[in-house]
Amino acid sequence: MITVAPFVSLRFQFPLYIINRSTLFFRERTQYLVYNTCHILRTTAKTMPVVAEYAKSNRSSCRSCSNKIAVKSLRLGLISKGRGGVDMTRWHHFDCFPTDSESIASVDDIQGLSALEKEDQDALTKLVEQCGKVPAKKPDEKKGKAKKHIMGPKGLTKAATSSKVIADNAKSSRSSCNRCSQTIVSKDLRVGLVTEDSRGFDITRWHHLGCFPIDFHPIDSVEDIGGYSSLEKGDQMELKYLAEVNKKDKTLIDDVQKMDEGDDEAIADNELTEETKKGKHSPVAKLVEQPGEPAKEDEDEESKKPASDEISEQKTKDVKNSPDSSKVISEYAKSSRSTCKKCSQTIAAKELRLGLVTRNFRGFDMKQWHHLGCFPVDSDPIVSVEDIGGFSELQSGDQDALKELVQQCGKQTLVDKMDEDNDDTEAKIKLTEETNKRKHSEVGEMVEEDESLTKAKQQMAKTHKVNMSESTSQVEVEAEITLSASDVKDKYRDANLLPKWKAFETVIFLERDDGLNDSEKIAAFDFDGCLAKTSVKIVGADAWSLMYPSIPEKLQSLHDQGYKLVIFTNESNIDRWKNKRQAAVDSKIGRLNSFIERVKVPIQVFIACGVSSSGGKGGKDDLYRKPKAGMWQLMKKHFNSGIAIDMDKSFYVGDAAGRKMDHSDADIKFAQASGLKFFTPEEYFIPSSTSPGT
């Protein structure tokens, strides 16, 4: 009787069958297997075992494409025997697995299948069905161009029959829009285009609702959208509107299709013609025309405009002229990805932001986010806080800030314009001069001091680095500030202060930093937005970064030249946040301490904690809050050892200069009121700028 037993060779890389006769014997030696005379039959190569799992790290590489396999992504491995009988696994991406050369008899042969998620198990089942099939050959581009498909955004084909549309609320913030490449925020409505690749697997391309290519993938009815019934009523209404817009815009879509059916040169010519026509009829082109110059377009050209252009223009006019075309919403930024429409700066996460919601000509809502101080109250006034969406969900301090903003609507903008009319400027100058005279008589100042202030005004107007007229620079008459030892406190209201920090009235100050020397030359700076990047809504001593890399070197150079460095900064949140005052104090002082430690230069600091009178409560402006010169006068009279200050050599640097993108003009007016030369941070800290101390 002959017994056939399978045997795995340690010497050879193929399976063996050993036919055992009565005379057959074998024994094992090191590294070799010795057989006596027997019949050894070689069989066909056995398929290598396949294992599937989620990558434990990102160190493995795909055997096919050589790219890294991301952690927690599905990977497939082919297990083979290496030298010495050690198992070796060759990992592949799921899409890179060689189905044409490696066959899998059944999905049950895949090791680790039961540990995978249901969706991945279904994908592997389809993969097993594809194993052994020869992939379709790609058309040879050299022999001739393949038949062109009408393409949409980012390569989406126009064939609606090969794709379907689904909609849901994003489960996380990991998905991104296929059209604009921006992240789709968690729980936001997203619309997916599901297509099938060459191997039969479904691929979903997600879009924002406003980014969905409705022109290339029309939606005839909401019943065609998968997952529609599970959405909230508001999201269902938006999808219904999307379907209605699709029906109304069929004429425009047909025009696009006809244009795309031509060859590349015809398409380019058509696009150039359309752009030329749009340029002629655009409002910008009309503004370029010189006054009195006759229009170049005649009635014949106007009558030749396509019907689609007329429809688009009519929709745009209807939206712009509609009284309810915009609304205001408020919320805390969910991330740091949004930017302010006015200043183009990033809106930090958890910071209060105001959104102006407008509707475009296709009926989609467009949100334009702004910082609180950048919101255009002059062009988009807010009648009442009840008109602000999300107002009730804000904290009490932010609700008070919005109430102040509403009261400013219709009166003035948050950012005063530098190009005011000459009549208004002269009126303000006269009013300021009369006020200064009254203050001067009340405090009984000497005539000589008034003359010195006039000289300081003239000197500041000559050396001012910002483009402003001489008539706008007014030095504020010094107020009587009396200070005694009993007036200095170790606490600010109910908040404790860190060591070396004291409080006087509405000012918190660091009088004597280690190594600080009083001087006739003062180099004064704002803190937030000038020396450090900070956010009001993010508290913490470490929640800041240097505004410019050259700051430590610049400050050290000024200290070496005998300047005393002083920081004058406003922080009204310390007064406004009654329930969180201690946190506000610790955050502000902690940041300043960290900054001083970072630059390694002794600095004197004054923090104005008072609130301005713009809140509508009828109170007066805080004496020490910029643009008032109270902090400068306090330092000059009581914290400079009686040394007279040389105004020609002293200066102030701040970011609130009243420019178009600045949040206010408090710094430039503070410099004017104090009689100091003024620089913006860009002028002073950028190496190409000319500034004192360089």
From Swiss-Prot:
EC number: 3.1.3.32
Chain ranges passing through the membrane: none
Residue span of region Disordered: 266-331
Annotated control of activity: Activated by the presence of DNA. Stimulated by XRCC1.
Domain of life: Eukaryota
Principal location listed in the UniProt entry: nucleus
Record InterPro entries: HAD-like_sf (IPR036412), HAD-SF_hydro_IIIA (IPR006549), HAD_sf (IPR023214), PNK3P (IPR013954), Polynucleotide_phosphatase (IPR006551), Znf_PARP (IPR001510), Znf_PARP_sf (IPR036957)
Compositional bias segments (type: Basic and acidic residues): 302-321
Enzyme superclass (EC): hydrolase
Cellular localization per UniProt: Nucleus, Nucleoplasm
Pfam family, one: PNK3P
Gene Ontology MF term list: DNA binding; polynucleotide 3'-phosphatase activity; zinc ion binding
Effect of inactivating the gene: No visible phenotype under normal growth conditions. Loss of 3'-phosphatase activity and hypersensitivity to DNA-damaging agents. Increased DNA methylation and transcriptional gene silencing. Zdp ape1l double mutants are embryo lethal and cause DNA hypermethylation and down-regulation of imprinted genes in the endosperm.
Biased composition (Polar residues): 322-331
Entry keywords, A to Z: DNA damage, DNA repair, DNA-binding, Hydrolase, Metal-binding, Nucleus, Repeat, Transcription, Transcription regulation, Zinc, Zinc-finger
Entry-linked CDD domains: HAD_PNP (cd01625)
ZnF start-end (PARP-type): 50-132, 165-247, 328-410
Sites where the protein binds Zn(2+) 1: C62, C65, H93, C96
Entry similarity comment: In the C-terminal section; belongs to the DNA 3' phosphatase family.
Stored PANTHER family: BIFUNCTIONAL POLYNUCLEOTIDE PHOSPHATASE/KINASE (PTHR12083), BIFUNCTIONAL POLYNUCLEOTIDE PHOSPHATASE_KINASE (PTHR12083:SF9)
Primary role: Nick-sensing 3'-phosphoesterase involved in a base excision repair pathway required for active DNA demethylation. The N-terminal DNA-binding domain binds specifically to gap sites and sharply bends the target DNA. Lacks 5'-kinase activity but is capable of 3'-phosphoglycolate end processing. Inactive on 3'-alpha,beta-unsaturated aldehyde (3'-dRP). Protects partially genes from transcriptional silencing by preventing promoter DNA hypermethylation.
Oligomeric form and interacting partners: Interacts with ROS1 (via the central region). Binds to XRCC1.
Protein name stated in the entry: Polynucleotide 3'-phosphatase ZDP
Organism: Arabidopsis thaliana (Mouse-ear cress)
